[in-house]
């Protein structure tokens, strides 16, 4: 329970800080990192096991965020 509260609070704080630096559509993308942060904190702080599905999911999340960022860069250049 502690880890869930801490990881969620950290994710919200970082997300709110990011919204101050970026516009809402770009900052909203980083909200998808919350499950990654929570799982990694569980692994580091509590010694939880991370399976292969976590790495697959992490890859998909990171790929999706990068894809959207690249598409937005193309729109800005046009």
Swiss-Prot record:
Membrane topology: Multi-pass membrane protein
Sequence ranges assigned to domain EamA in this UniProt record: 2-70
One Gene Ontology term, aspect cellular component: plasma membrane
Top-level division of the source organism's lineage: Bacteria
Keyword Transmembrane part of the UniProt annotation: yes
Residues passing through the membrane, by range: 2-22, 27-47, 49-69
Keyword Cytoplasm tagged: no
Record's keyword terms, sorted: Cell membrane, Membrane, Transmembrane, Transmembrane helix, Transport
Compartment list: Cell membrane
Similarity-based family: Belongs to the EamA transporter family.
Protein name (database record): Putative permease-like protein YdzE
Source organism: Bacillus subtilis (strain 168)
Taxon lineage: Bacteria, Bacillati, Bacillota, Bacilli, Bacillales
């Amino acid at each position: 329970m502690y880890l869930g509260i801490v990881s969620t609070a950290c994710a919200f704080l970082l997300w709110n800080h990011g919204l101050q630096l970026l516009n809402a559509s770009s900052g909203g993308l980083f909200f998808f990192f919350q499950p990654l942060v929570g799982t990694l904190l569980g692994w580091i702080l509590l010694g939880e096991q991370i399976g292969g599905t976590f790495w697959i999911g992490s890859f998909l999340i990171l790929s999706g965020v990068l894809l959207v960022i690249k598409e937005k860069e193309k729109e800005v250049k046009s």
